[in-house]
């Protein structure tokens, strides 16, 4: 993440000075433009983010991906066997937890299954969590998770996922969803998220680092499981 922000020029190796940003806005530039009256939406930190992004090559997320919605069957459809049903609580930027509920295979035979390179993005609850799938899946996600499919070759899926999980997008999600009592990020707002575009070679470099970090994380998980098994066997042997 540090390398991404550094390459985008949003941080550097020099000591940071405290920046005080003040804004004075007219009603025509606030409520009439955005429809928002909550003060949180107009915090100076968001103006600063906008000013920094304005200096970079960018595109709207909706220009880069095709956004697909999933289904929301309701808790009455939950069962212990069938197609795994992934909810936001099962999703994090490092992967998917094993879902605790399933859906009937016959009833939901035609429900969309996310495929390889699909980016899962949460829009409700813990908004803005992104994870890219490495393989095709036989699972269904809740309606609170969008399926993003990259349609422009100028952006790599791993790079885009990294940006989506970065403070650059987190702040945009925070601004958009902050006015709701229950956090909800509208798909129309998500499509307007500003994505900085780095040159292809730098995207490839960052993507390779992301892949390497996931591989190391998987290896660490295997070693941890083996260590736990050894401890359990040692305890059983001395019992």
Over which residues does each language-model region extend?
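A short glycine-rich beta-alpha junction/loop motif
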Residues: 139-146, 179-202
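Glycine- and charge-enriched low-complexity intrinsically disordered segments
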Residues: 157-168, 175, 179
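Sequence-specific dsDNA recognition surfaces
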Residues: 59-74, 89-116
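A short beta-sheet element
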Residues: 109-112, 122-163
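Short hydrophobic-aromatic micro-motifs
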Residues: 85-87, 119-122
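Non-catalytic DNA-recognition/assembly elements of restriction-modification systems
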Residues: 1-71, 200-239
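Short coil/turn segments at secondary-structure boundaries
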Residues: 16-17, 73-82, 175-177
